[in-house]
Amino acid sequence: MANIDKDPTKGLNAAVAAELRAERKAQEVTFDDLVERISLSRATTWRLLNAERLITIEALVEIASALGVSVLEIVERAEKRLAKKTPPPRRRGRRHALAMA
């Protein structure tokens, strides 16, 4: 089983990538325009925005700045996205306790 912290397609990394893509699209910034605004290569930017690679804080700052949005806002949105996808923890024994009452 893959470690969620090291797998770029899961967890917060994937949610951050999704939020960066959503922000780019909301602002109608083309991928090529974004690449021109930052120092990252086209291939690296593609991998980061598609959660194929773990995003560094430096890359996150650069991409967010190029889109005119704060890193905090992107991370908060990503956390909300994760919260929607994460089911609440299951409580064990509750059904059994109610049946005995």
Segments the model singles out, each with a brief description of its role:
Residues 1-28:
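A short, Lys/Arg-rich alpha-helix, primarily the initiator
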Residues 2-4, 75-101:
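Short, charged recognition helix plus adjacent turn
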Residues 21, 32, 61:
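Residues within the helices of the helix-turn-helix
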Residues 24, 35, 64:
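The alpha-helix within a helix-turn-helix
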Residues 52-65:
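Short, basic-rich loop-to-helix N-cap that marks the start of a DNA-contacting helix
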